[in-house]
Amino acid sequence: MSLLTEVETYVLSIVPSGPLKAEIAQRLEDVFAGKNTDLEALMEWLKTRPILSPLTKGILGFVFTLTVPSERGLQRRRFVQNALNGNGDPNNMDKAVKLYRKIKREITFHGAKEIALSYSAGALASCMGLIYNRMGAVTTEVAFGLVCATCEQIADSQHRSHRQMVTTTNPLIRHENRMVLASTTAKAMEQMAGSSERAAEAMEVASQARQMVQAMRTIGTHPSSSAGLKDDLLENLQAYQKRMGVQMQRFK
């Protein structure tokens, strides 16, 4: 896996799924391929994106700044600086300085990532802030190692909370989760349908699922009543994909 592929993988792992994720993936690919060289416009676009947490925006802004060539005097962006200040916690800043002293002696991506993984996400963000604010200088490879370690820490905590939700025994949460997933799957079916001859069929299935979820939410139902809804819809989606010759490797 090339360095930039690895960076893209880690960064996208902390972006919530949805159309915005696809848009960000495209922007990252363009930046890494040298096709997007307008850092100012890129940062303005990033700043106004909805849904993303300030820290995710800060990390993306840091990656764009590292990758897109720009004039030396280009102003640093406040939204990135605020996101990478370790929540203003002096403890994070102390650790960030210690981490910076260690990684500036490193020259490889993996070496820097290995060292960085033993620090908290707050300390890692502060360390990125030092580099972003030009208070410290490291090679691009080392900076990318820092980025990937931060994303790994964030993705780990997201995974833990996701696993807690998936394995929860609370029937109300499980019921709501199944309905949300059914709605999302319906949306995916509508997006995939496009203008193919089977589009009407896909739209019909998706529309029925949406109506079912809406009815369940409106009148209130027993928590176990949604159990088959998501599975039926996923089955329909997978059967539809096969007929269309589309194969998603993993769809949950």
Curated annotation (Swiss-Prot):
Pfam families: Flu_M1, Flu_M1_C. InterPro entries: Flu_matrix_M1, Flu_matrix_M1_C, Flu_matrix_M1_N, Flu_matrix_M1_N_sub1, Flu_matrix_M1_N_sub2, INFV_M1. SUPFAM superfamilies: Influenza virus matrix protein M1 (SSF48145). GO terms for biological process: viral budding from plasma membrane. One of its GO terms (molecular function) is structural constituent of virion. Residues 1-164 are annotated as: Membrane-binding. It is a peripheral membrane protein. A motif (Nuclear localization signal) lies at residues 101-105. It comes from the Viruses. It is found in: Virion membrane; Host nucleus. Keywords: Host nucleus, Membrane, RNA-binding, Viral matrix protein, Virion. GO terms for cellular component: host cell nucleus; membrane; virion membrane. Residues 165-252 are annotated as: RNP-binding. Plays critical roles in virus replication, from virus entry and uncoating to assembly and budding of the virus particle. M1 binding to ribonucleocapsids (RNPs) in nucleus seems to inhibit viral transcription. Interaction of viral NEP with M1-RNP is thought to promote nuclear export of the complex, which is targeted to the virion assembly site at the apical plasma membrane in polarized epithelial cells. Interactions with NA and HA may bring M1, a non-raft-associated protein, into lipid rafts. Forms a continuous shell on the inner side of the lipid bilayer in virion, where it binds the RNP. Determines the virion's shape: spherical or filamentous. Clinical isolates of influenza are characterized by the presence of significant proportion of filamentous virions, whereas after multiple passage on eggs or cell culture, virions have only spherical morphology. Filamentous virions are thought to be important to infect neighboring cells, and spherical virions more suited to spread through aerosol between hosts organisms. Belongs to the influenza viruses Matrix protein M1 family. Most abundant protein in virion. When expressed alone can form virus-like particles in transfected cells. Homodimer and homomultimer. Interacts with NEP. Binds ribonucleocapsid by both interacting with genomic RNA and NP protein. May interact with HA and NA. Cannot bind NP without genomic RNA. This is Matrix protein 1. It comes from Influenza A virus (strain A/USA:Phila/1935 H1N1).
